[in-house]
């Protein structure tokens, strides 16, 4: 499965958008990275988020796909996935505690940027 995540960096001196595109391809290798770096439940949530984003990217004019990625359930799932960006690995399991949750919430960055950072970290692209 392929999808592109676009990070919006602002505007240049000509008021043109500055973007950075990250292209992801879920392969056996990236599946192994996801499996090694995450637990089963988290991997399932990540898979759901990636799948819906990829589906929307393939046809952004489809109102059904647009409503799927803007639904409250999807946003909550994406939020849960992003919280693990600052989780710690303890005995081979990702653990989130008060310190990591507080660090995540204090960043106050748009979730799109955080999701981009997380995927780039998992795939070694950034």
Positions of PLM-derived features:
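Short, intrinsically disordered N-terminal pre-domain segments
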Residues: 1-12
């Amino acid at each position: 499965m392929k999808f592109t995540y676009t990070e919006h960096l602002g505007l240049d001196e000509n008021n043109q958008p500055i973007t950075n595109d990250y292209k992801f391809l879920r392969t056996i290798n990236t599946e192994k990275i996801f499996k090694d770096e995450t637990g089963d439940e988290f991997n399932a949530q990540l898979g759901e988020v990636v799948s819906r984003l990829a589906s929307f990217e393939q046809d952004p004019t489809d109102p059904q796909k647009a409503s799927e990625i803007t639904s409250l359930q999807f946003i909550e799932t994406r939020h849960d996935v992003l919280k693990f960006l600052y989780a710690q690995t303890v005995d081979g399991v990702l653990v989130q505690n008060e310190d990591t949750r507080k660090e995540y919430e204090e960043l106050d960055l748009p979730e799109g940027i955080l999701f981009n950072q997380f995927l780039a970290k998992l795939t070694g692209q950034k």
